[in-house]
Amino acid sequence: MDTTLVEVPLKRSMIKAADQVVLVADGGKFPPNKVTVTTSTDLDEALRGADFVFSAIRVGGLEGRAADESVAAGCGVLGQETVGAGGVAYGLRTVPVAVDIARRISVHAPDAWVINFTNPAELEDAWLDYAGLNHLGWLRGVHVHGRDVLPDLLADSVRLESFEEGKLFGAEWLRTLGAIPNEYLHYYFTREAVESGASRGAFPLEQQKRFYTAPSLESWEQTRLEREQTYMAETRDDERDTDDLDGGGYERVALDLMHAIASDKRTTLILNVPNKTTLSCLDADAVVEVPSLVDSNGARPIAVGQVPDEGVGLVTALKVDERATIRAAISGERAHAVKALALHPLVDSVSIARKIVDAHPFLSGVFRAR
């Protein structure tokens, strides 16, 4: 079956770079005359007849990200792109664009599967009992041939501190929890250690400028490795483990997801899906991050252990804040934007929330008092 891949860069200046990377990256892996790769700046035209749509957008670009981090830090709270004030600010300007894209897909490709990039994971040779939200989950069991080997891992300090989460949290704290939390929980467990850290937002902005000056597969790979090496660098003293850098990235998992749907090949992946009855602390419509069974019918959550008791309050609070962010983004009202920021546990202040909205160059002009 012939396949057409249409890339839709957000800026015309990105087209040449995208073409160059795809052309070289192919390297003969695609069957000759079976895959056609094109680029377009017309989203509606690109969507027509699509079976799958991959969405990976950063509204406001890296300039927006740098502002997310620097404004939050300047107001005395954590300056990080994903969690806290930075994550809320990113959501406030992204939701309207995502809704517009969804509407256009419903018109031009109503039968398409839409895969939105978050941070999915693949299960290989083991069953991972993992539950939570995006960037806020707990690994509570690792089952190999029917046996949970997580207790053995927690008892072995050397092995436990040989990977990223073990180095980040330390063996003693992980044993106290009886689970391995997602690395982003570090921002909640040790707020005082990270709130004083420098913002990383300016680094990828400069890095991107270098890449688009002379795009190539080599510079693309170098850019990717630099990004992985420096991510959450403020939380650790050592270099990131090479195993974490060579995993292929979540783009590989997204392709596995597409393949499972297209070929009806049953696959289990950790994905963000509607909760239904999976986690008892959340309602059926809440989006959760859990192991999911994927086939031609899509992805369905699999029954897993519940969120640890100590995590229930945080999970429910962040889900409330997530919905407040969506409401603010759609309404465009300053009061709702302030509320969304103030409700986040890493902000937890109405006065600071107001300062962030007024000081943020990507928010102040949009969220004005009504």
Annotated model-derived regions:
Residues 59-128:
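Rossmann-fold NAD(P)-binding glycine/threonine-rich loop
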Residues 2, 36, 113:
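Residues at the starts of beta-strands that form the adenosine-phosphate
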Residues 36-49:
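Short acidic low-complexity segments
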Residues 6, 40, 117-118:
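Structural motif
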Residues 126-370:
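Long, compositionally biased stretches enriched for glycine and/or charged residues
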Residues 11-14, 47, 62, 122-125, ...:
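Flexible loop/turn segments at secondary-structure boundaries
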Residues 1-32:
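Glycine-rich phosphate-binding loop and adjoining beta1-alpha1-beta2 segment
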Residues 47-57:
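N-terminal Rossmann-like NAD(P) cofactor-binding module of classical short-chain dehydrogenase/reductase
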